[in-house]
Amino acid sequence: MSKKKTEELVDALSELTVLEMAELKTLLEDKWGVKAAAPVAVAAPAAGAPAAAVVESTDFQVTLTEAPADKKIGIIKVVREITGLGLKEAKDLVEAAPKELKPTAPKAEAEDIKKKIETAGGKVTLKGL
């Protein structure tokens, strides 16, 4: 790929919103048959030792699963705060639930997002990565 073509691609990607970038990530995962998650190394248990407990996820995918019609305004406000989206983009995201809010978030941040959305009246799922 030429340097000019690469720079044009970088410029085009830089103009995408967070929501558009998340959709692009999903499309690329589907097209290439991959998952954009960091690999997790799991050590084998020592010989004769019992298997270790299940490793708890440190990163989570946060998905808005439900936004009741009578609670949408409050949920949109929280989504804007979390994602930095504009009013229209946040409204579109909330109305299209179930929709991914954050592709990757540390556990504390994911739980905080879940608490805020649930306080506003929505429902969220956290999927460990």
From Swiss-Prot:
It holds the Pfam family Ribosomal_L12_N. One of its GO terms (molecular function) is structural constituent of ribosome. Belongs to the bacterial ribosomal protein bL12 family. It comes from Protochlamydia amoebophila (strain UWE25). GO terms for biological process: translation. Forms part of the ribosomal stalk which helps the ribosome interact with GTP-bound translation factors. Is thus essential for accurate translation. NCBIfam families: L12. InterPro entries: Ribosomal_bL12, Ribosomal_bL12_C, Ribosomal_bL12_C/ClpS-like, Ribosomal_bL12_oligo, Ribosomal_bL12_oligo_N_sf. Coiled coil: none annotated. Keywords: Ribonucleoprotein, Ribosomal protein. One of its GO terms (cellular component) is ribonucleoprotein complex. This is Large ribosomal subunit protein bL12. It comes from the Bacteria. Homodimer. Part of the ribosomal stalk of the 50S ribosomal subunit. Forms a multimeric L10(L12)X complex, where L10 forms an elongated spine to which 2 to 4 L12 dimers bind in a sequential fashion. Binds GTP-bound translation factors.
